[in-house]
Amino acid sequence: CKQIIQNHTMSTTSTHYVYQEPAIEFVTVAVQLCLYLEQAEEQERADFIEKMLCLLPLLYLKARLLPKATEEMDGYPERFVTEYEYESMRQAIAQKLGSDDAYLEVFVEDMRYSDEPITAFISENIADIYQEVKDLACNYQTREEAVMNDALVSCLEAFEQHWGQKLLNVLRPLHTLSLHVDE
């Protein structure tokens, strides 16, 4: 993905939103996260936790730094992550974390209507994030500015609506796990 962007910026003086520095940096981190998650099964548990504690906050920061853009096409960007891929990702992370996958969450909408803590899962939240940023990365590979633009717009809207909060929510339990990784 980074090579696509570099090739384009070398061959043109385009200042389109999708080639501006904040967009390039966000997509670069998104691609790094996707590549790492796709190799999650091969990673040691401690390394996985540590890498998530580095990549997720960086992804959050890069998303926050993205300026607003407007859609250029009708409809929604193409979705690439299948239900099977999503579930495989979720299961790989859940297996890696074992019983530590579940955590009590208070920053969810359902908490308003409950006196009991809500159980959430690191694996599910990370799989949700993966789905959004992988779809973005795949749309970027089309090299069509309008498609890339609308994929960024859609990903940023989803960030504001749900996956930004999910990202922040998993940092707490991941931080705790990182402190007790040897136990």
What are these regions (language model features)?
Residues S14-E38, D101-E124:
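Solvent-exposed, charged interface segments at domain starts and junctions
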